Amino acid sequence: MDMEKLKRMQARGGVRTGDGKGTPRRKVKNVHKSTGMDDKKLQTSLKKLNVQPIQAIEEVNMFKSDGNVIHFAAPKVHAAVPSNTFAIYGNGEDKELTELVPGILNQLGPDSLASLRKLAESYQSMQKAEGGEDKKDDDEDDDDIPDLVEGENFEDKVE
């Protein structure tokens, strides 16, 4: 057999790769995602708890201890009130508290308000530190501006 033809066939994947004459061709392993099975198992366990869907929930925010927030936009929520169980479906995003501040203030509890105060204090201290650096920069910039000539008033010339 021609070597070039053999290389083309190997590149296509139509040639046996193995030890000897009677070995079968290599099978490609298919990896199946099991998200469907997990979802079915979750649905059956929620059905056992007799959950009811809750409509008209626009967003869900879960506050973590490190100050970040897990934000669900337009989630599906199911609840079983007797067993105090809630299931939230949707794509959750990790966000910082500062990203959600304007619309989230009415949802904050006492713990979250304390973390918001700490965040505001740290933000103010960062601004003061940056402001101190800017003041130094302003002093350096003043060297480039020439002083006014004595005896001349530029405001009179503008009017």
Swiss-Prot record:
Compositional bias per record (Acidic residues), positions renumbered to this chain: 136-153
UniProt key word Transport: yes
Annotated InterPro entries: BTF3, NAC_A/B_dom_sf, Nas_poly-pep-assoc_cplx_dom
Transmembrane segments: none
Ranges of Basic residues composition bias in the record: 23-32
This protein's GO CC annotations: cytoplasm; nucleus
Database matches in PANTHER family: TRANSCRIPTION FACTOR BTF3 FAMILY MEMBER
Key words, A-Z: Cytoplasm, Nucleus, Protein transport, Repressor, Transcription, Transcription regulation, Transport
Listed GO biological process terms: protein transport
Oligomer and partners: Part of the nascent polypeptide-associated complex (NAC), consisting of EGD2 and EGD1. NAC associates with ribosomes via EGD1.
Source organism superkingdom: Eukaryota
Family: Belongs to the NAC-beta family.
Protein name per the record: Nascent polypeptide-associated complex subunit beta
